[in-house]
C-alpha cells in the first residue's frame, strides 16, 4: 500500500496531474488542495492512495492526511467508491466536507458531483461518527443558522474560498451574532 509519495508536479491535465518520481512519471488524481496550492515544478511529499481493481489501477494524491482519511472513509460508503470520492474532494475541501457531515447539511452535500438527496442522507448516516477526531470549533456551533449561511455566502461573493472562511468561523463564538457581525469578525481575520 502506498501512503506517501515525494514527487514533483510535471503538468496538470483535466482531472489528472502528472507527477515525477525519480525517472518515472505517473498519472494521479489530485484533490482540490493539490490543484489549489501547487503549480508545475513544485516538489512535495503528498499523501496517497493506490486503488487497484480488475479493470484499472489509479493513484490519488492529497495535500494532507485529513484529505486522505476523508477519501478513505468516503470510498467505503456504499455506491460511492474511489472515483466519486475523488470527484467530491476535487470540488470541496476535506474540512468543509467534514463540516457538512457533522452539521448534516444535505443541501450542500447534494450540490457535490455524483451526490443526490438520498446519497447525501446515506453519507450522513454512514459517516456521522467517522470524523469526530477532526471536528472544529464551528462543528459545535449552529452551522445551520441563517445568519451564518448568509455570512458565508457574502464572504464567498467577496472572493474568499469556503475553506478559508470555515477555518476562521471555527475560531469564532457565533452565539447571538448577526450576519453583519459574523462578516466583520471574519474580515478582520481573513
Curated annotation (Swiss-Prot):
Keyword Translocase in annotation: no
DNA damage listed as a keyword: yes
CDD domains per record: UBA_RuvA_C
Region feature Domain II, mapped onto this chain: 64-138
Region of interest called Domain III, as start-end residue ranges on this chain: 143-190
Similarity-based family: Belongs to the RuvA family.
Complex formation: Homotetramer. Forms an RuvA(8)-RuvB(12)-Holliday junction (HJ) complex. HJ DNA is sandwiched between 2 RuvA tetramers; dsDNA enters through RuvA and exits via RuvB. An RuvB hexamer assembles on each DNA strand where it exits the tetramer. Each RuvB hexamer is contacted by two RuvA subunits (via domain III) on 2 adjacent RuvB subunits; this complex drives branch migration. In the full resolvosome a probable DNA-RuvA(4)-RuvB(12)-RuvC(2) complex forms which resolves the HJ.
Protein name (database record): Holliday junction branch migration complex subunit RuvA
Species: Petrotoga mobilis (strain DSM 10674 / SJ95)
